[in-house]
Amino acid sequence: MLSSIPHGGGTSAEIEARRGISKEAARLIKAQTSWRRLDLLLAGNIKPGDVYATFTWDNAHYPKDRRDALRQWSLFRRKLTAKRRRCGKDLIAFWSLQRGDLGNRWHIHCVCNCGGETYEELEKLWGRGTVKPYPVERDKDGGFYTSIARYMARFRPEKLGQRAWSYTRNVRRPEKDSFFVDDNATLSVPEGCIILDRAERKTSFGEYQFIKYEIPNF
C-alpha cells in the first residue's frame, strides 16, 4: 500500500482533506477491523484441507453461561493439543463462541490445523454434543479465508472487554514492512500471484493504493 503524507500549509479544508486520505489509508494498512485481522491470521496459519467446524452442546452438557462454555472449550482444546503432541504436531486453532442462531444456543465455530484427524475423532474428543466439520476450501472470490473470517467475527461481544474470537498462542503474526517510494510509484504484485482485491483513491490532496494478493502454493 502507498500512502501520501500530509504536508504543512494550505487552507483548513485542504489540511483536513489530506488528513482524511492518510487516515483512510492507515485503516487499510493496519487492518484494524476484526474480520480483516482474522483474515490475515488465517492466511498465515491455515491451509487448504484443514478443518472448519461448528461445535454444539447437547442438553446434558449445555453450559450454564458464557464462562462455563469457555471452560468446557478449554478442556477440549487441552485434550486435542495433547493428542496432536503425541503425534509430534502442534495445535493451531481459531475459535468464536457465539449465540444468536441455532436456536439461540451457545455454539463454537473453529478453524484448526486438524486435517489429519478424522471427523469421528474430533467428535469423540469433544464428547459434549455434535461436531459439523468441513474442509477449508477456496472462496468464490479466490481467497481461502475471507468468508470464514467474516462469519466468525460477525457477532459483537456482549460486554466490554470480551473478544469476538480468540486463537492459540502459537499462531504466526503478519509481518510488516514499510518504506518510502517516489510519488509516481505504482504497486505491482510478484509474478504469478493471484490478485484478490484492489483499491485506489486519488484526490487533489493525496492518494493511496491497496492490493491484496495470494502467493500460489505458498
Regions found by a protein language model. Give the residues of each.
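Right-hand nucleic-acid polymerase module
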Residues: M1-N104, C114-F218
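Conserved, short, structured surface segments that act as functional micro-motifs
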Residues: H107
